[in-house]
Amino acid sequence: MKFFASCAKGLEYLLADELLALGASKATATISGVNVEGALRDAQRAVLWSRLASRVLWPLTEFDCPDEDALYAGVAELPWHEHLSTGHTLSVDAHVSGTAITHARYAAQRIKDAVVDTIRRQGLERPSVDVESPDLRLNLSLRKGRATISVDLGGGPLHRRGWRMAQNEAPLKENLAAAVLLRAGWPRAYADGGGLLDPMCGSGTLLIEGALMAADVAPGLQRYGSDIPSRWRGFDRDSWQQLVTEARERDSVGRAALKQVIHGSDMDPHAIRAAKENAQVAGVAEAIWFGVREVGDLQTRPQATGVVVCNPPYDERLAADAALYRKLGDTLQRVVPQWRASLLCGNAELAYATGLRAGKKYQLFNGAIECALIVCDPIAVPRRTPLAAPTALSEGAQMVANRLRKNLQKFKKWRAREGIECFRVYDADLPEYSAAIDVYQQADGDRRIFLHVQEYAAPATIPEADVRRRLGELLAAAREVFEVPAERVALKSRERGKGGSKYGRFEQRNEIVNVREHGALLRVNLFDYLDTGLFLDHRPLRGTMAQQSKGRRFLNLFCYTGVASVQAAVAGASATTSVDLSGTYLQWCADNLALNGQAGSKHKLVQADALAWLEAERAHFDVIFCDPPTFSNSARAEDFDIQREHVRLLRAAVARLAPGGVLYFSNNFRRFKLDEEAVAEFAQCEEISPRTIDPDFERHVRIHRAWRLTA
């Protein structure tokens, strides 16, 4: 059976790992949650033990839902007397997007009506509504015309552990606190005898969560006590009781063995008082030392190693002070230089203000606030002394370094004139060093440079040892020229095996970097996938379309992460429509639009097979961008082959052009041949490929071809 565990954005991969460790058969991270395969017992175990999940949703039904009548009918088909006992209460949470039903509260009310009417038609007592503590809490997910009705097995938000009696302003949610601790490696550090320190502990969330984690306490034990999370009739009470009994045994053993290695301080005596009250209720007061203390007054800790966790102030209510962040960084380097730090900062600029070198950086959300989590291990990185001579580059690496410097000089004026911050600096210029190197400059914060290195397949006649050596030399040269540490180099290397050369596994860092192109901020992921979310070679064509879209309607087919749509929106397009079969890419597109303040009804996202959608659509557009894949096969659509389907595709796209409109068609199939005779029957067509290649791709002019079509 499949179920869904939701979480805050940025925690998806951590949650997937946690659910697998808890016994799930399969856990796949998606946007703001994890799709899980497992039995009902696995879902109930997650309710009891997950430190990261927000909710655990067990599906009851799924159906097409084009309008409110379909929603009512789909819910009414269920035998609700088998799910809700007589006299029990009901509540519904609803989440809607990309659908004709735009108000979540209205959707929730229609579901309540359907449940109540169904039960009353059976002659049973009408259930009452209790929004605070219902016997059965239902959840509606309505996305793009598809509705899923689920039981919220936890009965509400799982971050509520049951111990928070007092809080200071802007408290940290407990499941986000757990993520900060897990990214810091706190469970392993505790097992190795390390300590835990929070020098700005507020009401104690991080330290209390850390103590309960160290004591092996199930988060759901105190939340539910002797009660059960849900009175849904399908809830397995016997299984739940077995899980609770096991958890209580572990709780007893863990609390008895809990070591007193946890310290917290804060300059606010009211916050410390709240922290002590919360720790008392959580049953860990004796394991945590709390005291009133300024950050700069911290003393050296007795443990040689340990973990610092901290959530410094950063939102509108608690005005962030860069000087405070700097004092925090300086103090930690002085008192716990060899410890590991996991700091949840408001943004990259504040993280940079600490002066600490982040080995890893993650993007998390504290409610609606986007935060930067930096992990420093160790806190104080040894400084290179003037006497230490840098490692000399090999002869081959020096050749690559010289070419990189030459290319940088070559592109300097062009980049300055066009405002280019992301570009290709090397494209197998030296044949024996066969790779592409792309530069991505962070648009915010400390404007860091990231390198994206993609290795090309080497001929089978070249020994593997030589291939590896040359790649190492190329990386060494790139790091020296751009002065970037290894953790800011995303390498997509190839591995030889059966079937030839292929790319190996990528890192799973979930690290998002914001970059800028043509005035638009864009989210790229350099490490987790083969592609980054931004095809640099299409830069000139995107710029042309953005300029032509001002005050006009823009359509982006096979939109990928929606970069062209975002740039058209920023340039002043009256409306944009972005079509892609992938929900993941559409969410990425939505995030890009929101990053630029362009979220709203005039920017439509359509999850559909682009060709089928075109042939059914009746709206017209002024500027259309069509950049299809070479091949595509999906369980949700017919197989697609650009050579076979391009005439049909272009005919359908041209039919959607408004008078005076223009279609830009591009693809990167090397052997593609446009059927000029067939296309001439319905459009005027001009190849514009040379005009769509910027200087950084002049060595690779066949990376794509492009045409301009008008009706």
UniProtKB/Swiss-Prot annotation:
**InterPro entries referenced in this protein's UniProt entry, alphabetically:** 23SrRNA_methyltr_KL, DNA_methylase_N6_adenine_CS, RlmKL-like_Mtase, RlmKL-like_Mtase_CS, RlmL_1st, SAM-dep_methyl-trfase, SAM-dependent_MTases_sf, THUMP_dom
The enzyme's main class, written as a single word, is transferase
Known catalytic reactions:
guanosine(2445) in 23S rRNA + S-adenosyl-L-methionine = N(2)-methylguanosine(2445) in 23S rRNA + S-adenosyl-L-homocysteine + H(+); guanosine(2069) in 23S rRNA + S-adenosyl-L-methionine = N(2)-methylguanosine(2069) in 23S rRNA + S-adenosyl-L-homocysteine + H(+)
Q: Which UniProt key words apply to this protein?
A: Cytoplasm, Methyltransferase, RNA-binding, rRNA processing, S-adenosyl-L-methionine, Transferase
Q: Name one GO molecular function term.
A: RNA binding
Cellular compartments annotated: Cytoplasm
Q: Which Pfam families match?
A: Methyltrans_SAM, RlmL_1st, THUMP, UPF0020
Q: What is its EC number?
A: 2.1.1.173, 2.1.1.264
Q: Name one GO cellular component term.
A: cytoplasm
Similarity-based family: Belongs to the methyltransferase superfamily. RlmKL family.
Report the function annotation for this chain. Answer: Specifically methylates the guanine in position 2445 (m2G2445) and the guanine in position 2069 (m7G2069) of 23S rRNA.
Enumerate the NCBIfam families for this protein.
Answer: PRK11783.1
Q: What is the name of the protein in this document?
A: Ribosomal RNA large subunit methyltransferase K/L
The taxonomy runs: Bacteria, Pseudomonadati, Pseudomonadota, Gammaproteobacteria, Lysobacterales
